[in-house]
Regions:
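Ser/Thr-rich, Pro/Gly/Ala-heavy low-complexity intrinsically disordered linkers and tails
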Residues: 21-130
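Short glycine/serine- and small hydrophobic-enriched flexible loop segments
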Residues: 205-213, 264-275, 331-335, 412-419, ...
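Internal amphipathic alpha-helical repeat/solenoid segments
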Residues: 152-200, 208-222, 226-254
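Sec-dependent bacterial lipoprotein signal peptides
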Residues: 1-20
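Extended ligand-binding clefts on enzyme/binding-domain cores
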Residues: 131-166, 194-199, 237-242, 254-260, ...
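Solenoid-like repeat scaffolds
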Residues: 492-501
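Non-catalytic accessory regions flanking glycosidase/transglycosidase catalytic cores in CAZymes
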Residues: 50, 56, 62, 74, ...
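Active-site-adjacent structural elements in enzyme catalytic domains
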Residues: 220-231, 253, 267-271, 283-296
Length: 524
């Protein structure tokens, strides 16, 4: 079903709609997108290989919805007893589990104190939860990163506090209690509207895990978001989440899925298992296994081994070979392979990295022979040997084959994977993107706009300083030391951008990127 985007956007369908490019209500008949209204996130001032996949698990029963408003979400940061480790990277003798060599975060006497937000009777754990302290607390910098990667210039304390400060603002603006006590969701409309989508839910669950050690409510929030996910199953694949809910916590616009949301929810559950263990109120590992198996069964192309748009998108659907490039999540596919032992996830990983390279080398070449590294929002033919940019109007609108708010997330997804895995197949496309971005901007992030053709021509009317573009480029710039000045300029632009200047999507991608930029991420 095709999303009908809000008119309050620039030049075309969606870059500032603050929305997911993943509205996927269930198709009727031939399975293309149906007409429906997309959620407009609004500004913050809106007071508003073909192994047989595993059989899906039995879905949980929908929980009864009531009107409890849930707890307040305010957070105050206070010093933690245990100091964090400095973000300076030093080589570690042991390589990472998958590819490349990792670097230990090291130690520093002046690293300051980890932010352990506020006070809480249960120290941030849900009832019957496991250990009181997370394994990878915010500010602890315990993840080893690939040798040669960099961070913005500045003290660890300053980077941490910038990320922590924006987390507090983001939480106040977007985190909302669900209709049943103890449940939570991320509002896609800013301060007051209750509408949400599964993409936002996946982002929010990852954010909650990464905020452990900063926010004493992090685990309770995560478990509440997990409960909200369970209350909104897809009709076709009940272990997966229906893509769209309204303020009354009812699934709307077709109870089908959006693949990117499910991928992030599954990954968040693996992170939670690593962060807190699975012996508490929620068995995160078991929940992750169920959803990973369902994704492989319903949302990965059976022969093309690439993510489909949704659980309705399998062959013979006309969109079966359509790739939403923001679904390129190599760190997720890598983690799913390691966790399940399912070889097919290795094929999905290989296919994803191949598709990025094929789109860059085949379609981003300029007249002088150099590559911009830009990829389209949507590609067709992902179920065949070589994908190609979607034609205008193929799925969402006129810019389906251009680089806008969907493809803008690819540098972030590739970047976080390279930070932890060091896979050279991610580094090569990152180098292309970094070279192009430094050149087109002349080192000034304000010269980067929100949309381009694949050969680097700015789209008419595309605004500057968009966080959905700049924040992912900053994560990409972490890949190599020769990007340091460019990375520092991007970091300055990111920190300076007020939350009121962006909508849900830009602010949420900004926060997730700031966790990576301050080295407050980890791999499952």
């Amino acid at each position: 079903m095709r999303r009908a985007h809000s008119e309050r956007v620039w030049w075309a369908p969606a870059i500032l709609a603050g929305l997911v490019g993943c509205g996927n209500p269930s198709p009727s008949g031939d399975a293309g997108p149906d007409d429906h209204t997309a959620i407009d996130a609004g500004p913050s001032t809106d007071t508003g290989a073909d192994a047989r996949p595993s059989t899906d698990a039995t879905p949980e029963t929908d929980a009864t919805v009531n009107s409890d408003a849930g707890p307040s979400m305010d957070v105050t940061v206070s010093p933690d007893a245990s100091p964090p480790m400095d973000a300076t990277v030093t080589p570690d003798a042991s390589p990472s589990a998958d590819a490349g060599t990792s670097a230990d975060a090291g130690t520093s006497a002046d690293a300051g104190t980890s932010a352990d937000a506020g006070t809480s009777a249960d120290a941030g754990t849900s009832a019957d939860a496991g250990p009181l302290r997370p394994t990878f607390p915010f500010g602890g910098h315990r993840q080893r990163f690939t040798v040669g990667t960099i961070a913005p210039t500045g003290t660890t304390v300053a980077l941490d506090e910038a990320a922590a400060s924006f987390y507090r603002a983001w939480k106040t603006m977007y985190l909302r209690p669900g209709c049943e006590a103890g449940t939570f969701y991320v509002s896609t409309a800013g301060a007051t509207s209750g509408a949400t989508v599964s993409e936002a839910h996946g982002y929010g669950m990852i954010i909650a895990v990464l905020a452990a050690g900063l926010d004493p409510e992090a685990r309770a929030i995560f478990d509440g978001m997990h409960a909200f996910y369970l209350q909104h199953p897809s009709e076709r694949s009940p272990v997966l989440m229906a893509w769209n809910q309204n303020a009354a916590c009812m699934s709307i616009n077709g109870r089908t899925t959006a693949t990117d949301g499910d991928l992030d929810i599954a990954y968040a559950l693996l992170l939670a298992d690593r962060q807190w263990g699975s012996d508490g109120a929620v068995n995160y590992a078991a929940a992750a296994r169920r959803i990973i198996e369902a994704i492989l069964r319903f949302e990965i192309h059976p022969t093309g081994q690439s993510p489909m748009l949704a659980d309705w998108g399998a062959p013979p659907n006309r969109y079966a070979g359509t790739l939403r490039t923001s679904d390129t999540m190599p760190d997720h596919f890598r983690a799913f392979r390691a966790f399940t032992g399912e070889a097919r996830w290795g094929l999905v990983l290989d296919t994803a990295l191949f598709h990025v390279d094929a789109l860059q080398t085949g379609f981003s070449r300029r007249m002088d022979g150099t590559l911009t590294g830009l990829v389209p929002d949507f590609a067709t033919g992902a179920d065949t040997a070589i994908p190609r940019p979607a034609a205008a109007g193929w799925y969402e609108g006129a810019n389906d084959g251009n680089f806008t708010y969907i493809a803008a997330r690819v540098p972030w997804r590739l970047g976080v994977d390279y930070l932890s895995a060091g896979d050279p197949r991610a580094l090569t496309p990152l180098r292309r993107l970094n070279t192009w971005a430094r050149e087109v901007s002349a080192g000034d992030p304000a010269r980067i706009v929100g949309g381009y053709t694949l050969v680097g021509t700015a789209l008419t009317g595309a605004p500057a300083r968009e966080m959905v573009v700049l924040a992912p480029l900053a994560v990409a710039a972490m890949a190599e030391a020769d990007n340091q000045r460019w990375l520092d300029a991007l970091w300055g632009a990111i920190v300076a951008r007020p939350i009121t200047a962006e909508r849900y999507l830009g602010n949420t991608v900004k926060l997730l990127s700031m966790f990576a930029l301050s080295r407050n991420t980890f791999a499952p």
